[in-house]
Amino acid sequence: MRTLAIDIGGTKIALAIVEEGTIIQRYQIATPVVQDVTKFVQAILEKVTEWLPSIDYVGVSTTGYVTPEGITSINPETLNFPVPFPLAQTLEQLTNKPVSILNDAQAAAWFEFVQLKNPSLNMAFITVSTGVGGGIIIDGKLHKGNSGLAGHIGHMSVAIEGPLCGCGQRGCVESMASGNAIQKESEATFTETMSNVELFKQAAFNPKAEAIINRSVQAVATLCCNLKACLDLDIIVLGGGIGLAEGYLERLNKAIQSRPSVFHIPVTPAHGDYDACLLGAAFQFKE
């Protein structure tokens, strides 16, 4: 079985042919800045037209809130789709293939759960990337909730007087810990423009850079402890460009260990590395 996996993020879209859990071919494009769903899908498919005859299924993981009607952007600053955005329906029409779609972190959570050596564990996947998202596995099942909203843990508030999030709340984890949040804080702190990659390099000898990263880490640590308190999870798996940046996981586990022991929970790196969401898109067809 070959699946065309499509992972839609705020800045880029990753595409791959996945067979038996292995990426056979891959391609990456910038996320199209178009509001028309047909043009959006065409911009994706034109890069991989030659793949389609060999594909059995299309699996999509996407930032945003996925409902049967389409995709809704909870935080338009991360990805601003018209509401609802009927991506899956349009993909089915243009590819004539079965299409399944999940929120990206929910998809990654399922992929990471399948990789666990102990399938009895209750777990969460957290991605710290352009935004912050999550997926929750309880009793061996992906918990999506009645409407599909479950797992949007980046919009749990960890600072009631914190910065205004694009979703409309204050102090969301996403508004304090995401790549976008780190970039905003960096721009407010330094006179020269600095990428997040450079910020992490600077942190070893620049206290201001370290403080910006630590702000993100502390917000995610609070989120992890809250998930432990709320769901009594066994493990958390961390992914995303920020979450997998050098030194971030070590900082995070140290921050969690500084909290009361009843809220401690182990955090491990994603088995799928930076491709957890992409592989999760394909693994929707593995029940």
Swiss-Prot record:
Q: Which Gene3D superfamilies match?
A: 3.30.420.40
As its record notes, the protein acts as a catalyst of: an N-acyl-D-mannosamine + ATP = an N-acyl-D-mannosamine 6-phosphate + ADP + H(+)
UniProt keywords (A-Z) are:
ATP-binding, Carbohydrate metabolism, Kinase, Metal-binding, Nucleotide-binding, Transferase, Zinc
InterPro entries recorded: ATPase_NBD, ManNAc_kinase_bac, ROK, ROK_cs
The annotated pathway is:
Amino-sugar metabolism; N-acetylneuraminate degradation; D-fructose 6-phosphate from N-acetylneuraminate: step 2/5
Q: Name one Pfam family in it.
A: ROK
Tell me which EC number(s) this protein carries. Answer: 2.7.1.60
GO biological process assignments: N-acetylneuraminate catabolic process
From what superkingdom does this record's organism come?
A: Bacteria
What residues bind Zn(2+), as annotated? H155, C165, C167, C172
Q: How does it assemble?
A: Homodimer.
Family according to the record: Belongs to the ROK (NagC/XylR) family. NanK subfamily.
Function text: Catalyzes the phosphorylation of N-acetylmannosamine (ManNAc) to ManNAc-6-P.
Q: What is this protein called?
A: N-acetylmannosamine kinase
**Which species is this UniProt entry from?**
Vibrio cholerae serotype O1 (strain ATCC 39315 / El Tor Inaba N16961)
Encoding gene (name): nanK
